[in-house]
């Protein structure tokens, strides 16, 4: 089984040089990339705390900002005239997508994109974060139910003599058609202006697998969710990358359910990508280093079950997002710095190197390793008997030292199969061509 595996010499991997050398598209034809999407520049400017992520294999924007040449995220107030309702129920820009001007939005969006991405050859991640409403009627529950209520009211006003079932059907159709027009139109404009960017919406697809209290929690998407996601084929077809969220709710802390939760969320992204006819559509889950809405940092095990799980499924990488709230005080900045230095950094070096070595050993360097269905617990984590991670004397970047043993290479081939990069094929991605 190991006869095809490439011999790998002793590896001394200086991650600083790797990060500085990656000026090509951020994630294309690389096994696994970590993107630091955080305004941790404030830690240095306001508190004198230098969160130095450049020493790891983490693609960052200059100044560690949310927007730059490697990635740009557009929040709702930063791109066009996104319609929504405030928490008080007041409409902004019409409130509903079917009650707002798409032309005005696209004209404003045109200017916003050029201002945020001045370079026409931008080839980084381009993420749109619209969270007020969801494009499928059935998914607008709880606080988002206002979009269904106001959609019904709009139809009722237009047709006061219609019975309730007619109103419901028309309201649903009008809302979903308008939502599609707004989202697809915004993506299309972005791709026209910056065609090399990896355009997509944060949080899509979702799996809605939040039933953590169930004694037999499987992590699977609830019944009907995949069918609803299949109705968003227009979104997957228009996207150039998928950005599902794998933020870990605090309810998962201390349970054994994290891997199941993440596994099925990432799997749903790959499922819709395949259904859209683009198996090479990059999947880049959004992760946090904290439990969502808390200041509690993830343990090493939770990193394995989120970042490691994403890598095991063949994700192109992960986006590590840190809330502005987590950088407000000197204490929180120091906590982030210590975590990066002692826990996150070494783990990122481990998993990115593991994915790289697996790609070279199993997939001829021309594809990503994807965990075989028969090995549900396998992760691209390096064998501590074969590798060590050590700081460089004098405070330089971490260095990975070691070599894959024959046993390591055989185990990789047993646990992982290949998803070839475009232009390569074969069991081990050893042949050029698409057939």
Swiss-Prot record:
Top-level taxon of origin: Eukaryota
GO cellular component terms, A-Z: cytoplasmic vesicle; extracellular space; hyaluranon cable; lysosome
Protein name: Hyaluronidase-1
Hydrolase keyword on record: yes
Statement: the UniProt record of this protein carries the keyword Secreted: yes
Annotated GO biological process: carbohydrate metabolic process; cartilage development; cellular response to interleukin-1; cellular response to pH; cellular response to platelet-derived growth factor stimulus; cellular response to UV-B; hyaluronan catabolic process; hyaluronan metabolic process
Enzyme class: hydrolase
Signal peptide feature range: 1-21
Annotated EC: 3.2.1.35
Biological classification of the source: Eukaryota, Metazoa, Chordata, Craniata, Vertebrata
Glycosylation sites recorded in the entry for this protein: 70, 99, 107, 121, 216, 256, 350
A Pfam family that the UniProt record links to this protein: Glyco_hydro_56
Membrane-crossing segments per the record: none
Function text: May have a role in promoting tumor progression. May block the TGFB1-enhanced cell growth.
Catalytic activity: Random hydrolysis of (1->4)-linkages between N-acetyl-beta-D-glucosamine and D-glucuronate residues in hyaluronate
GO function term, MF aspect, one: hyalurononglucosaminidase activity
Localization: Secreted; Lysosome
Keyword field: Disulfide bond, EGF-like domain, Glycoprotein, Glycosidase, Hydrolase, Lysosome, Secreted, Signal
Active site: 131
GN (gene name): HYAL1
Cysteine pairings via disulfide bonds: 43-333, 207-221, 358-369, 363-418, 420-429
Span of domain EGF-like: 418-429
């Amino acid at each position: 089984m190991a006869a095809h595996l490439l011999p790998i010499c002793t590896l001394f991997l200086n991650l600083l040089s790797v990060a500085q050398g990656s000026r090509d598209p951020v994630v294309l034809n690389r096994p696994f990339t970590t993107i630091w999407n955080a305004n941790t520049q404030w830690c240095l400017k306001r508190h004198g705390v230098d969160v130095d992520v450049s020493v790891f294999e983490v693609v960052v924007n200059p100044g560690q900002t949310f927007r730059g040449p490697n990635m740009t995220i557009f929040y709702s107030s930063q791109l066009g005239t996104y319609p929504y309702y405030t928490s008080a129920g007041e409409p902004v820009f019409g409130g509903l997508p079917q009650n707002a001007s798409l032309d005005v939005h696209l004209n404003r969006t045109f200017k916003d994109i050029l201002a945020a991405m001045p370079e026409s050859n931008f080839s980084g991640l381009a993420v749109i974060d619209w969270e007020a409403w969801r494009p499928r009627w059935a998914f607008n529950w709880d606080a988002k139910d206002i979009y269904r209520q106001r959609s019904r009211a709009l139809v009722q006003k237009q047709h006061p003599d219609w019975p309730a079932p007619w109103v419901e059907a028309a309201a649903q159709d009008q809302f979903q058609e308008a939502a599609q027009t707004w989202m697809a139109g915004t993506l299309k404009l972005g791709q026209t202006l910056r065609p090399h960017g990896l355009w997509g919406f944060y949080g899509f697809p979702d799996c809605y697998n939040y039933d953590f209290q169930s004694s037999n929690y499987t992590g699977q998407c609830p019944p009907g969710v995949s069918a609803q996601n299949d109705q968003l084929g227009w979104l997957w077809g228009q996207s150039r990358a998928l950005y599902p969220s794998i933020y870990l709710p605090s309810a998962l802390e201390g349970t054994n359910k994290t891997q199941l939760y993440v596994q099925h969320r990432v799997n749903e992204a790959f499922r819709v990508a395949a259904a859209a006819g683009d198996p090479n559509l990059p999947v880049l889950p959004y992760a946090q280093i904290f439990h969502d809405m808390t200041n509690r940092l993830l343990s090493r095990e939770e990193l394995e079950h989120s970042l490691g799980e994403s890598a095991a499924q063949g994700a192109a990488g992960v986006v590590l997002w840190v809330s502005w709230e987590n950088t407000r005080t000197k204490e929180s900045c120091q906590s982030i710095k210590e975590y990066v230095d002692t826990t996150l950094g070494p783990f990122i070096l481990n998993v990115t190197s593991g994915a790289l070595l697996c790609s070279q050993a199993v997939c001829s360097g021309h594809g990503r390793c994807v965990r075989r269905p028969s090995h549900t617990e396998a992760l691209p984590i390096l064998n501590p008997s074969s590798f060590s991670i050590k700081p460089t004397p004098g405070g330089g970047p971490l260095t990975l030292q070691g070599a894959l043993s024959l046993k390591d290479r055989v185990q990789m081939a047993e646990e992982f199969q290949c998803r070839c990069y475009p232009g390569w094929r074969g069991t081990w991605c050893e042949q050029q061509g698409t057939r």
